[in-house]
Amino acid sequence: MSPKSTPANASDGSLLTDSQAIERIFQHIDERTTDVGTTVWREPVEHYFDQARFDAECALIRRLPSAFCPSSALPEAGSYIARSAAGRPLLVVRGVDGKVRAFLNACRHRGMQVAAGSGCARAFSCPYHAWTYGGDGRLRGVADVVKFGEDCRGDRDLIAFPCHEEGGLIFAVLDPASECDIRGFLGEMMSDIAEKHFEDWYYVGQRVIHGANWKVALDGYLEGYHFQAAHPETIAPRTYTNVMAFEAYGPHMLVGYPAKTIEKLKDIPK
């Protein structure tokens, strides 16, 4: 660690303010330093591909709130998105009451997925035996129910997951027995997220990249050391290389890389 480097910070319970982050970044730019750890950490290679570790991580993720999509992705009643999250097929729907609900995307008869992709629908019908569910997850119809028997009624609604909408984002917990307590999980970070007004953003779409190791991909977003070498024509001309502000907040972290336009803030009174 450089003598002038600032160690990574552990929050005392309060979020780093914008002015505090800016002051720290300006100091790093002037002194050619960055936030770093207090010790050297070597990540074991097996952490990137060990299946048992991956399964344990997915189990943990399923018990915690995760941002599934922006609110603008479900603009009207019947809007839905169906995709996998942490290894589970999820169906998120905005109901006629405006409330967003999350379900396991699996028919309660034989487990076929009842929806794919995204769109707008009043009901979801299983492509195997045509069991039909409403946007509230309730079983609405069973083909040839007289011959099938009334046993299919009552407890055959789609399995619901805890779901919460706030700050223009839709959160879900992939464990029916858990709670989606966003404020308890994110604390002050939720207020910071709400200030971004994501509800006013326009949803364009999503792209799924198959085959990538998600940890390797994520690593690239946790450091700015590679900007000059890997992005000499795009990011590097506009962003300071290897200058970072880091703040730990409970199990969460805030990471920021300054664009060179940050210099304009020097002329603005604090």
Residue spans of the language-model regions?
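Rieske [2Fe-2S] iron-sulfur-binding domain
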Residues: 74-176, 180-187
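Intrinsically disordered, low-complexity boundary segments flanking structured domains
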Residues: 52-58, 150, 159-161, 189-195
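N-terminal short leaders/motifs
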Residues: 22-51, 112-125, 157-162, 191, ...
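C-terminal catalytic domain of Rieske-type non-heme iron oxygenases
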Residues: 3-11, 94, 99, 105, ...
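A structural signal for well-ordered alpha-helical scaffolds and beta->alpha junctions
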Residues: 50-54, 156, 182, 214
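N-terminal pre-ligand scaffold of iron-sulfur
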Residues: 2-106, 110-116, 162-165
